[in-house]
Amino acid sequence: MVTVVLSLKTLIKFYFHNNMTIELIKSGGDHRGKILFFKSEHLKINFFELKKNYARGGHYHDYPITYVLISGKIQHRTKFLDSEKEIIEELSAPAIIKISPNTSNLIISINNSLFLEMFDAEYGSKLYHRYRNIVIEKNKMHNHIEFNSSLNVENEFEDSRGKMFFLKFNGKNFNLIELKKNYARGGHYHKFESEHIVLDGEIEYFENNLETDSESKKIITNPEIIITKPYIAHMFFGLKNSYFIESFLGKYEAIFYDNYRKIVEEKMSN
C-alpha cells in the first residue's frame, strides 16, 4: 500500500510532450471577482468568481453553452426568447446548467460563488436588456471596494496524460484535469469525500468498494457530477480526450489501489 501526499507549494512541473491542449490564456475580473480563461484545441472553459449579491450574465448566445456551479449558492434565471417561458431557481453547488441557443440567462450570487462556462464556438453575445438591467442595478447597490479575490491558481503540472491546474477558492481545492485518449488517472482512494465533475469528452469511470470488493463502472459522455465517497477506489480512463474537475477540502492524500494503479502506470509507459 502506497500513500501519496501532494504539496501544492512544492509541486514540480514536468513537461514531456508539446502537444498538450489546455492552456490558461489570460485572467481578468472586476469588483465582482476574478475570471480565468482557459482554452483547448476546441473548447473554451472560463471560471468566474461571483461575490455575494452581485450578478453576471444578462445576455444570450447563438450557440449552446454549459454552466457548472462549482462552489456556493446562486439564483439562476433563464428566459426563452421565443416564448413567455421563464425559469427562476435557486441552486447549490455542485450543479450543471445547460443553456440552449438564443436563451438568455442571469446568475445572481446568494453566497460567494464560483462557476464556469464552457462552449465550442467563437465567443459572441447579445444583450437581453431586462436581465442586463438587473446586473447594472446590482452594481449600483454596492460600494465598489478595491479589487480582491478568493480565487487563485496555486500551481500546474503536466505529464503524458495531460495538464492539471490546481485552483483554490475560499479555502477549497479545485483541480482542472486534462485526460488524453487511452490514458488513465486515479488508481487510488482517499480518506475524504471528493467531487468529480466530468466536463467534456468520453470517460469510462471505475469504482471499487474496498469493504465489499465490488466494482462498478460506467461510460460518461456528457457533463456529470460524481460524488466519490471515502475509501472508494476510483479510476478514470479516457475513451476520448477529456476534461474533468476534482474538488476536496484539506490536504491531498491518496492511497494506491494496486489493481487500478497498474493500469494507470501501464498506459503511461506505452
What are these regions (language model features)?
Residues 63-77, 192-208:
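Glycine- and acidic-residue-biased ligand/ion/polar-headgroup-sensing regions
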Residues 81-101, 210-230:
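Short acidic-glycine-tyrosine-enriched beta hairpin
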Residues 56-58, 76-77, 99, 104-110, ...:
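Short beta-strand His + acidic residue motifs that chelate non-heme Fe in jelly-roll/DSBH
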Residues 23-25, 83-84, 108-152, 213-214, ...:
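Double-stranded beta-helix
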Residues 62-63, 95, 103, 111, ...:
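A generic "binding-loop/recognition-motif" signal
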Residues 5-44, 132-173:
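A short, N-terminal "cap"/entry segment at the start of jelly-roll beta-barrel domains
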Residues 46-61, 175-190:
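Conserved short histidine dyad/triad with adjacent acidic residue
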